[in-house]
């Protein structure tokens, strides 16, 4: 139902923005701002190389609690962040890692995807895309805040962090989409020399 006097006047006629529901406008605005305006990026400092894996706990898509510090205490752990499940860029990022799963496994890399979506959205996204890794539902934003990737509109900024034995060894501050796995593998090749 349109707001009287705001979106139903002569200027609103025919404009798709005016026809969006009241509940959709904030989501569309948030997606637009985080996509096209980098100054709406992070409100805090992102973790840097050398930082310890934050001791935060978050539920995965099935409601199972995951303690990140414990999960990443030994070996490689990739934690990647995306703004919204089932959106084009986020799907490309996850599918890149899915498609390189065998290569990542050979290198001993475990993967967690994180967004501020709820568990059911994460489960649907995981199932639709056949992701072989867990997706964390950071509804209370504890993980995004601990990693310094919560943007000014409260969503996770696209980024990725690779940990070795609980210490950050690589950061992709902008979070690649279709080539996320390639960038991780390229870094791992430099470590094996």
Kindly give the residue locations of the regions a language model identified.
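Positively charged n-region of N-terminal signal peptides that target proteins for export
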Residues: 22-26
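N-proximal helix/coil linker or "cap" segments that precede and/or mark the start of modular domains
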Residues: 31-55
């Amino acid at each position: 139902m349109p707001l009287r006097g705001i979106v139903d006047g002569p200027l609103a006629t025919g404009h798709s923005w005016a026809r969006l529901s009241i509940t959709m406008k904030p989501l569309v605005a948030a997606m637009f701002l985080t996509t096209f305006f980098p100054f709406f990026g992070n409100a805090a400092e992102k973790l840097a190389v050398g930082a310890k894996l934050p001791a935060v706990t978050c539920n995965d898509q099935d409601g199972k609690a995951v303690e990140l510090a414990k999960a990443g205490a030994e070996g490689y752990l990739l934690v990647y962040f995306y703004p919204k499940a089932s959106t084009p860029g986020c799907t490309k990022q996850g599918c890149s890692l899915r498609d390189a799963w065998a290569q990542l496994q050979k290198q001993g890399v475990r993967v967690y995807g994180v967004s501020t979506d709820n568990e059911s959205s994460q489960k649907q996204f995981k199932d639709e895309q056949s992701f072989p890794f867990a997706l964390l539902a950071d509804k209370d934003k504890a993980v995004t805040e601990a990693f310094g990737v919560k943007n000014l509109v409260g969503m996770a900024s696209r980024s990725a962090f690779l940990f070795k034995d609980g210490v950050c060894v690589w950061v992709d501050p902008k979070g690649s989409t279709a080539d996320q796995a390639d960038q991780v593998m390229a870094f791992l090749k430099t470590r094996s020399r």
